[in-house]
Protein backbone atom coordinates (compact mmCIF):
# COMPACT_ATOMS: atom_id res chain seq x y z
CA UNK A 1 0.00 0.00 0.00
CA UNK A 2 1.66 3.22 -1.19
CA UNK A 3 0.69 6.85 -0.96
CA UNK A 4 2.03 9.59 -3.22
CA UNK A 5 3.60 12.63 -1.60
CA UNK A 6 1.11 15.49 -1.45
CA UNK A 7 3.02 17.86 0.82
CA UNK A 8 1.52 16.33 3.96
CA UNK A 9 4.73 14.57 4.97
CA UNK A 10 3.72 11.16 3.60
CA UNK A 11 6.83 9.38 2.35
CA UNK A 12 6.17 7.87 -1.10
CA UNK A 13 9.07 5.42 -0.70
CA UNK A 14 7.66 3.63 2.34
CA UNK A 15 4.70 1.31 2.61
CA UNK A 16 2.04 2.35 5.09
CA UNK A 17 -0.17 -0.28 6.67
CA UNK A 18 -3.59 -0.45 8.30
CA UNK A 19 -4.39 -0.80 11.98
CA UNK A 20 -6.33 -3.65 13.55
CA UNK A 21 -9.22 -1.19 13.94
CA UNK A 22 -9.38 -0.45 10.23
CA UNK A 23 -8.98 -4.14 9.40
CA UNK A 24 -11.98 -4.90 11.62
CA UNK A 25 -13.92 -2.07 9.97
CA UNK A 26 -13.19 -3.58 6.55
CA UNK A 27 -14.36 -7.02 7.69
CA UNK A 28 -17.51 -5.51 9.22
CA UNK A 29 -18.41 -3.50 6.10
CA UNK A 30 -17.72 -6.51 3.88
CA UNK A 31 -19.92 -8.69 6.06
CA UNK A 32 -22.80 -6.21 5.91
CA UNK A 33 -22.51 -5.88 2.13
CA UNK A 34 -22.30 -9.67 1.77
CA UNK A 35 -25.66 -10.09 3.48
CA UNK A 36 -27.36 -7.21 1.65
CA UNK A 37 -25.77 -7.46 -1.81
CA UNK A 38 -23.74 -10.65 -2.15
CA UNK A 39 -20.14 -11.85 -1.99
CA UNK A 40 -17.47 -9.12 -1.75
CA UNK A 41 -13.85 -9.17 -2.95
CA UNK A 42 -12.82 -5.69 -1.81
CA UNK A 43 -14.26 -2.85 0.23
CA UNK A 44 -13.39 0.83 0.57
CA UNK A 45 -13.28 2.03 4.17
CA UNK A 46 -13.37 5.63 5.46
CA UNK A 47 -10.80 6.84 7.99
CA UNK A 48 -11.01 9.61 10.61
CA UNK A 49 -8.46 11.67 8.66
CA UNK A 50 -10.49 11.75 5.46
CA UNK A 51 -8.54 9.18 3.44
CA UNK A 52 -10.50 6.24 2.02
CA UNK A 53 -8.65 2.93 1.86
CA UNK A 54 -9.40 -0.11 -0.28
CA UNK A 55 -8.94 -3.39 1.59
CA UNK A 56 -8.98 -6.90 0.15
CA UNK A 57 -11.67 -9.23 1.53
CA UNK A 58 -10.24 -12.71 2.11
CA UNK A 59 -13.52 -14.39 3.09
CA UNK A 60 -17.13 -13.48 2.27
CA UNK A 61 -20.00 -15.85 3.12
CA UNK A 62 -23.76 -15.23 3.16
CA UNK A 63 -25.40 -17.65 5.56
CA UNK A 64 -29.01 -16.59 4.97
CA UNK A 65 -31.01 -13.47 4.13
CA UNK A 66 -30.07 -11.74 7.38
CA UNK A 67 -26.66 -13.08 8.42
CA UNK A 68 -23.17 -13.82 7.16
CA UNK A 69 -19.50 -13.34 7.84
CA UNK A 70 -16.43 -11.85 6.19
CA UNK A 71 -12.73 -11.49 6.93
CA UNK A 72 -9.94 -9.05 6.12
CA UNK A 73 -6.20 -9.36 6.57
CA UNK A 74 -4.07 -6.86 8.47
CA UNK A 75 -1.23 -5.35 6.47
CA UNK A 76 1.52 -3.53 8.40
CA UNK A 77 3.53 -2.08 5.53
CA UNK A 78 7.13 -1.35 6.45
CA UNK A 79 6.31 -1.11 10.15
CA UNK A 80 7.80 -4.04 12.13
CA UNK A 81 4.64 -5.57 13.57
CA UNK A 82 4.03 -9.02 15.04
CA UNK A 83 0.40 -8.88 13.88
CA UNK A 84 1.17 -8.40 10.19
CA UNK A 85 -0.96 -10.81 8.15
CA UNK A 86 -3.45 -11.79 10.87
CA UNK A 87 -7.08 -12.31 9.87
CA UNK A 88 -9.89 -10.40 11.55
CA UNK A 89 -13.36 -11.87 11.03
CA UNK A 90 -16.78 -10.33 11.50
CA UNK A 91 -20.08 -12.16 11.83
CA UNK A 92 -23.09 -9.92 11.35
CA UNK A 93 -26.84 -9.99 11.57
CA UNK A 94 -28.89 -7.43 9.68
CA UNK A 95 -32.14 -6.69 11.50
CA UNK A 96 -34.90 -4.09 11.19
CA UNK A 97 -34.68 -0.99 9.02
CA UNK A 98 -34.95 2.37 10.77
CA UNK A 99 -37.58 4.79 9.48
CA UNK A 100 -35.19 7.71 9.87
CA UNK A 101 -32.51 5.88 7.86
CA UNK A 102 -30.04 6.04 10.74
CA UNK A 103 -28.68 2.54 11.33
CA UNK A 104 -28.02 1.34 14.86
CA UNK A 105 -24.70 -0.52 14.95
CA UNK A 106 -23.96 -2.93 17.83
CA UNK A 107 -20.39 -4.19 18.24
CA UNK A 108 -19.23 -7.08 20.43
CA UNK A 109 -15.86 -8.78 20.77
CA UNK A 110 -15.61 -12.54 20.51
CA UNK A 111 -12.89 -15.21 20.47
CA UNK A 112 -9.38 -13.92 19.94
CA UNK A 113 -10.13 -10.41 21.20
CA UNK A 114 -8.51 -9.76 24.56
CA UNK A 115 -10.22 -8.63 27.75
CA UNK A 116 -8.96 -5.55 29.60
CA UNK A 117 -8.20 -6.41 33.22
CA UNK A 118 -6.25 -3.32 34.34
CA UNK A 119 -7.05 0.38 34.67
CA UNK A 120 -5.39 3.05 32.59
CA UNK A 121 -5.93 1.78 29.05
CA UNK A 122 -8.87 3.94 28.06
CA UNK A 123 -11.18 0.89 28.12
CA UNK A 124 -13.06 -0.17 31.24
CA UNK A 125 -11.74 -3.32 32.97
CA UNK A 126 -13.85 -6.34 32.05
CA UNK A 127 -14.57 -5.09 28.54
CA UNK A 128 -13.19 -6.44 25.28
CA UNK A 129 -10.09 -4.63 24.04
CA UNK A 130 -11.71 -2.64 21.24
CA UNK A 131 -10.80 1.03 21.53
CA UNK A 132 -13.26 3.89 21.05
CA UNK A 133 -11.38 4.97 17.93
CA UNK A 134 -11.69 1.49 16.45
CA UNK A 135 -15.38 1.29 17.34
CA UNK A 136 -16.01 4.59 15.58
CA UNK A 137 -14.21 3.37 12.45
CA UNK A 138 -16.25 0.16 12.45
CA UNK A 139 -19.53 2.06 12.91
CA UNK A 140 -18.74 4.57 10.16
CA UNK A 141 -17.77 1.82 7.70
CA UNK A 142 -20.85 -0.30 8.39
CA UNK A 143 -23.20 2.68 8.30
CA UNK A 144 -22.09 3.31 4.70
CA UNK A 145 -23.20 -0.20 3.76
CA UNK A 146 -26.23 -0.74 5.98
CA UNK A 147 -28.77 1.32 4.04
CA UNK A 148 -30.65 2.23 7.20
CA UNK A 149 -30.78 -1.31 8.60
CA UNK A 150 -29.68 -2.04 12.16
CA UNK A 151 -26.65 -4.33 12.23
CA UNK A 152 -25.31 -6.52 15.02
CA UNK A 153 -21.58 -7.26 14.70
CA UNK A 154 -19.35 -9.82 16.38
CA UNK A 155 -15.61 -9.34 15.85
CA UNK A 156 -13.19 -12.26 16.28
CA UNK A 157 -9.59 -13.17 15.48
CA UNK A 158 -8.70 -16.77 14.59
CA UNK A 159 -5.80 -17.85 16.84
CA UNK A 160 -5.92 -14.42 18.47
CA UNK A 161 -4.89 -15.76 21.86
CA UNK A 162 -1.69 -17.19 20.36
CA UNK A 163 -0.94 -14.02 18.39
CA UNK A 164 -1.40 -11.96 21.55
CA UNK A 165 1.56 -13.75 23.13
CA UNK A 166 3.77 -12.02 20.55
CA UNK A 167 2.59 -8.59 21.72
CA UNK A 168 2.83 -6.51 24.91
CA UNK A 169 -0.82 -7.13 25.76
CA UNK A 170 -0.37 -9.23 28.90
CA UNK A 171 2.25 -6.82 30.25
CA UNK A 172 -0.16 -3.90 30.00
CA UNK A 173 -3.17 -5.82 31.33
CA UNK A 174 -5.00 -7.29 28.31
CA UNK A 175 -5.50 -11.06 28.41
CA UNK A 176 -6.88 -13.75 26.12
CA UNK A 177 -6.36 -12.14 22.74
CA UNK A 178 -5.23 -9.15 20.72
CA UNK A 179 -6.44 -5.55 20.93
CA UNK A 180 -8.40 -3.84 18.16
CA UNK A 181 -6.98 -0.33 18.03
CA UNK A 182 -6.40 2.65 15.80
CA UNK A 183 -6.70 6.42 15.89
CA UNK A 184 -6.34 7.20 12.18
CA UNK A 185 -6.68 3.71 10.71
CA UNK A 186 -3.28 4.08 9.08
CA UNK A 187 -0.17 2.40 10.47
CA UNK A 188 2.88 4.49 9.73
CA UNK A 189 6.39 2.97 9.70
CA UNK A 190 7.60 5.21 12.53
CA UNK A 191 9.75 2.54 14.21
CA UNK A 192 12.03 1.87 11.25
CA UNK A 193 15.51 3.32 10.87
CA UNK A 194 14.47 4.86 7.54
CA UNK A 195 11.92 6.96 9.41
CA UNK A 196 14.73 9.00 10.96
CA UNK A 197 15.67 10.27 7.50
CA UNK A 198 12.01 10.97 6.81
CA UNK A 199 11.80 12.93 10.08
CA UNK A 200 14.61 15.26 9.01
CA UNK A 201 12.65 16.15 5.88
CA UNK A 202 9.37 16.78 7.73
CA UNK A 203 11.04 18.79 10.51
CA UNK A 204 12.97 20.94 8.03
CA UNK A 205 9.79 21.59 6.02
CA UNK A 206 7.98 22.77 9.14
CA UNK A 207 10.66 25.37 9.87
CA UNK A 208 9.55 27.27 6.75
CA UNK A 209 6.26 28.16 8.46
CA UNK A 210 7.01 28.15 12.21
CA UNK A 211 9.75 28.81 14.77
CA UNK A 212 7.97 26.41 17.14
CA UNK A 213 7.70 22.66 16.51
CA UNK A 214 5.40 20.23 18.35
CA UNK A 215 6.71 16.65 18.47
CA UNK A 216 4.07 13.96 19.07
CA UNK A 217 4.91 10.27 19.67
CA UNK A 218 1.51 9.02 18.49
CA UNK A 219 -1.60 9.88 16.51
CA UNK A 220 -3.73 10.51 19.61
CA UNK A 221 -1.23 13.14 20.74
CA UNK A 222 -1.06 14.62 17.24
CA UNK A 223 -4.83 15.01 17.10
CA UNK A 224 -5.09 16.81 20.42
CA UNK A 225 -1.95 18.92 19.97
CA UNK A 226 -3.56 20.63 16.99
CA UNK A 227 -6.50 21.59 19.19
CA UNK A 228 -4.28 23.13 21.87
CA UNK A 229 -1.72 25.05 19.81
CA UNK A 230 -2.40 27.90 17.38
CA UNK A 231 0.31 26.91 14.91
CA UNK A 232 0.50 25.98 11.20
CA UNK A 233 -0.26 22.36 10.40
CA UNK A 234 3.33 21.60 9.39
CA UNK A 235 4.52 22.60 12.87
CA UNK A 236 3.08 19.31 14.21
CA UNK A 237 5.18 16.20 13.58
CA UNK A 238 4.49 12.52 14.33
CA UNK A 239 7.77 11.13 15.65
CA UNK A 240 6.93 7.60 16.83
CA UNK A 241 9.70 6.23 19.03
CA UNK A 242 12.41 8.49 17.58
CA UNK A 243 12.49 11.23 20.23
CA UNK A 244 16.23 11.83 20.10
CA UNK A 245 16.33 11.91 16.31
CA UNK A 246 13.39 14.32 16.17
CA UNK A 247 14.88 16.69 18.75
CA UNK A 248 18.26 16.64 16.98
CA UNK A 249 16.56 17.39 13.65
CA UNK A 250 14.65 20.26 15.27
CA UNK A 251 17.87 21.81 16.55
CA UNK A 252 19.58 21.35 13.18
CA UNK A 253 16.65 23.15 11.55
CA UNK A 254 17.09 26.11 13.95
CA UNK A 255 13.75 26.06 15.74
CA UNK A 256 13.49 28.47 18.66
CA UNK A 257 11.21 26.20 20.66
CA UNK A 258 10.48 22.47 20.82
CA UNK A 259 7.30 21.11 22.43
CA UNK A 260 7.02 17.45 23.41
CA UNK A 261 3.31 16.59 23.53
CA UNK A 262 1.91 13.17 24.33
CA UNK A 263 0.53 10.46 26.57
CA UNK A 264 2.47 9.57 29.73
CA UNK A 265 3.42 6.07 28.55
CA UNK A 266 6.00 7.49 26.15
CA UNK A 267 6.87 10.74 27.90
CA UNK A 268 7.79 9.19 31.25
CA UNK A 269 10.55 7.28 29.46
CA UNK A 270 12.04 10.56 28.23
CA UNK A 271 12.23 11.76 31.84
CA UNK A 272 14.49 8.75 32.45
CA UNK A 273 16.78 9.81 29.59
CA UNK A 274 15.42 7.27 27.09
CA UNK A 275 15.35 8.86 23.63
CA UNK A 276 14.22 5.80 21.67
CA UNK A 277 10.98 4.86 23.40
CA UNK A 278 10.35 1.55 21.60
CA UNK A 279 9.39 -1.16 24.09
CA UNK A 280 12.28 -3.37 22.97
CA UNK A 281 14.89 -0.67 23.65
CA UNK A 282 14.30 0.37 27.26
CA UNK A 283 11.63 1.06 29.86
CA UNK A 284 12.03 2.65 33.32
CA UNK A 285 8.48 4.05 33.47
CA UNK A 286 7.44 2.55 36.80
CA UNK A 287 10.81 3.29 38.39
CA UNK A 288 10.59 6.92 37.31
CA UNK A 289 7.00 7.39 38.48
CA UNK A 290 7.70 5.62 41.77
CA UNK A 291 10.81 7.73 42.45
CA UNK A 292 9.07 11.04 41.75
CA UNK A 293 5.99 10.02 43.77
CA UNK A 294 8.28 9.04 46.66
CA UNK A 295 9.69 12.59 46.60
CA UNK A 296 6.22 13.77 47.57
CA UNK A 297 6.04 11.41 50.55
CA UNK A 298 3.78 8.55 49.50
CA UNK A 299 3.91 5.34 51.53
CA UNK A 300 6.17 2.37 50.82
CA UNK A 301 3.06 0.38 50.04
CA UNK A 302 2.02 2.86 47.35
CA UNK A 303 5.53 2.84 45.88
CA UNK A 304 5.37 -0.96 45.75
CA UNK A 305 1.99 -0.88 43.96
CA UNK A 306 3.35 1.58 41.40
CA UNK A 307 6.34 -0.67 40.75
CA UNK A 308 4.01 -3.65 40.28
CA UNK A 309 1.69 -1.82 37.86
CA UNK A 310 1.15 -3.32 34.41
CA UNK A 311 0.92 0.01 32.60
CA UNK A 312 1.45 3.71 33.09
CA UNK A 313 -2.26 4.44 33.43
CA UNK A 314 -2.58 2.01 36.33
CA UNK A 315 0.43 3.58 38.05
CA UNK A 316 -0.99 7.08 37.59
CA UNK A 317 -4.33 5.99 39.06
CA UNK A 318 -2.45 4.94 42.22
CA UNK A 319 -0.70 8.31 42.34
CA UNK A 320 -4.07 10.01 41.82
CA UNK A 321 -5.47 8.15 44.83
CA UNK A 322 -2.60 9.62 46.85
CA UNK A 323 -3.69 13.12 45.78
CA UNK A 324 -0.41 14.13 44.13
CA UNK A 325 -0.92 13.37 40.44
CA UNK A 326 -0.51 17.00 39.32
CA UNK A 327 2.68 17.42 41.34
CA UNK A 328 4.18 14.19 40.01
CA UNK A 329 3.36 14.76 36.35
CA UNK A 330 4.40 18.42 36.43
CA UNK A 331 7.71 17.27 37.92
CA UNK A 332 8.04 14.64 35.18
CA UNK A 333 7.40 17.33 32.55
CA UNK A 334 9.96 19.65 34.13
CA UNK A 335 12.50 16.85 34.29
CA UNK A 336 12.01 16.11 30.59
CA UNK A 337 12.60 19.76 29.73
CA UNK A 338 15.75 19.91 31.84
CA UNK A 339 17.11 16.67 30.35
CA UNK A 340 16.56 17.87 26.80
CA UNK A 341 18.33 21.14 27.55
CA UNK A 342 21.27 19.33 29.12
CA UNK A 343 21.56 16.65 26.44
CA UNK A 344 20.71 18.60 23.28
CA UNK A 345 20.78 22.40 23.56
CA UNK A 346 20.53 25.08 26.23
CA UNK A 347 19.79 27.76 23.65
CA UNK A 348 16.48 26.18 22.57
CA UNK A 349 13.29 26.36 24.62
CA UNK A 350 11.76 23.03 25.60
CA UNK A 351 8.16 22.68 26.76
CA UNK A 352 6.38 19.47 27.69
CA UNK A 353 2.65 18.71 27.77
CA UNK A 354 1.32 15.40 29.11
CA UNK A 355 -2.28 14.44 28.26
CA UNK A 356 -4.65 11.59 29.07
CA UNK A 357 -6.55 9.50 26.51
CA UNK A 358 -9.31 12.13 26.36
CA UNK A 359 -6.86 14.92 25.56
CA UNK A 360 -6.98 16.55 29.00
CA UNK A 361 -3.69 18.10 30.12
CA UNK A 362 -2.55 16.25 33.26
CA UNK A 363 1.00 17.59 33.51
CA UNK A 364 3.08 20.31 31.88
CA UNK A 365 6.18 22.47 31.89
CA UNK A 366 5.84 25.56 29.71
CA UNK A 367 9.08 27.33 28.89
CA UNK A 368 9.44 30.91 27.66
CA UNK A 369 6.59 32.44 25.68
CA UNK A 370 4.94 29.19 24.65
CA UNK A 371 1.76 30.11 26.57
CA UNK A 372 1.02 32.67 23.87
CA UNK A 373 0.22 29.90 21.37
CA UNK A 374 -1.38 27.43 23.81
CA UNK A 375 -5.17 27.57 23.61
CA UNK A 376 -6.34 26.41 27.04
CA UNK A 377 -9.75 24.81 27.12
CA UNK A 378 -10.33 24.96 23.36
Curated annotation (Swiss-Prot):
Which EC class does it fall in?
Answer: transferase
Which Pfam families does UniProt cross-reference here?
Answer: CbiD
- One Gene Ontology term of the molecular function aspect: cobalt-precorrin-5B C1-methyltransferase activity
The text of the family note is: Belongs to the CbiD family.
The biological pathway it contributes to is:
Cofactor biosynthesis; adenosylcobalamin biosynthesis; cob(II)yrinate a,c-diamide from sirohydrochlorin (anaerobic route): step 6/10
Under which EC number(s) is this enzyme classified?
Answer: 2.1.1.195
Q: Which GO terms describe its biological process?
A: anaerobic cobalamin biosynthetic process; methylation
Concerning InterPro entries, the annotation shows:
CbiD, CbiD_sf
Disulfide bond annotation, renumbered to this chain: none
**Gene3D superfamilies from the xrefs?**
CbiD-like
Q: Which NCBIfam families match?
A: cbiD
Please identify the protein, giving its name as recorded.
Cobalt-precorrin-5B C(1)-methyltransferase
Transmembrane portions of the chain: none
* Classification of source organism: Archaea, Methanobacteriati, Thermoplasmatota, Thermoplasmata, Thermoplasmatales
Q: Which PANTHER family does the annotation name? A: COBALT-PRECORRIN-5B C(1)-METHYLTRANSFERASE (PTHR35863:SF1)
The organism sits in which domain of life?
Archaea
Annotated organism of origin: Thermoplasma volcanium (strain ATCC 51530 / DSM 4299 / JCM 9571 / NBRC 15438 / GSS1)
Q: Which reaction does it catalyse?
A: Co-precorrin-5B + S-adenosyl-L-methionine = Co-precorrin-6A + S-adenosyl-L-homocysteine
Q: Which UniProt keywords apply?
A: Cobalamin biosynthesis, Methyltransferase, S-adenosyl-L-methionine, Transferase
Amino acid sequence: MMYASDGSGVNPFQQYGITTGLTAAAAAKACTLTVLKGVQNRVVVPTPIGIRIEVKVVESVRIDESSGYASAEKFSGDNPDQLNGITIRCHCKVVKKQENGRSKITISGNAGIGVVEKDGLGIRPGEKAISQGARKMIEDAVREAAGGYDVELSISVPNGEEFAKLTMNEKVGVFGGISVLGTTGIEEPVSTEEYELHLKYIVAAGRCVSKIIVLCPGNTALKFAKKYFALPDKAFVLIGDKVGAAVSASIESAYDHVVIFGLPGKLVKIAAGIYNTHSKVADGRMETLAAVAAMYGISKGAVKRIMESSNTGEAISIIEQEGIVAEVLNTIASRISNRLKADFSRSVGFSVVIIDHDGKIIGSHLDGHIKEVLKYGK
